[in-house]
Regions:
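Conserved SAM-binding loop
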Residues: 19
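C-terminal accessory helical subdomains adjacent to catalytic cores in phosphodiester-
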Residues: 2-16, 27, 31-48, 61-75, ...
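Helix N-cap/beta->alpha junction signal
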Residues: 22-23
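Structural motif
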Residues: 52-60
Length: 190
């Protein structure tokens, strides 16, 4: 009878999540997800924001594949408020985590439903009014109270986001990444 040995680390498939982001706020949020889910998330610099192309996405994905066994799930986390970038994104081979009009719709969904179309400036104002933790919201970094609020209200934000029509204003696909991370986390615990 053959012995059951665990595959050596070099022969095991690594699951890697690559999130190519548009800006600093998105990168900050992905860093929170890395902390909360302890998942192998790799973030490509937000400097690539407007320079996004199918070739760039393919290059970044291949850079992470150390072995042919590595499985890289590539996501693009972008705002839909710039039409020229939307056209570039549609040509890329990756899962879309698009927010319409902008990333802050995801933050707002942690507080309340938003079903009416809204522009980016009005959305930021609405976010700041929605809960005390967002009163002094700044795109640069999340405060500790905001991090805790996001973590505690993620499930309700996912439910709200799933009820919105993808790519319409308002909408966000960020919930897809959350669901995948929860699924990976659940499998790791089994």
């Amino acid at each position: 009878m053959a012995s059951k040995r665990e595959a050596s680390p070099s022969l095991r498939m690594r699951k890697i999540v690559l999130v190519i982001c548009e800006g600093e706020t998105e990168v900050g949020y992905i860093n929170l997800l890395k902390m909360w889910y302890r998942s192998p998330i790799r973030i490509v610099s937000h400097i690539e924001g407007t320079k996004i192309t199918p070739a760039l996405v393919e290059k970044r994905t291949k850079e992470l594949q150390i072995s042919h066994l590595d499985k890289v799930n590539t996501f693009l986390m972008y705002d839909m408020d710039v039409r020229t970038i939307n056209e570039k994104l549609q040509k890329c081979k990756a899962q879309m985590l698009l927010s319409n009009p902008c990333f802050e719709i995801w933050l707002l969904l942690h507080c309340k439903d938003q079903k009416a179309a809204i522009n980016s400036d009005s959305l930021i104002k609405e976010l700041k009014k929605s809960a005390n933790v967002w009163k002094n919201y700044s795109k640069a970094a999340f405060k500790e109270t905001q991090k805790a609020f996001l973590n505690n209200n993620t499930d309700v934000a996912v439910k709200r986001a799933k009820r919105l029509c993808e790519f319409q204003n308002p909408s966000t696909g960020i919930y897809k990444l959350i669901e995948m991370l929860k699924n990976l986390e659940g499998k790791r615990k089994e």
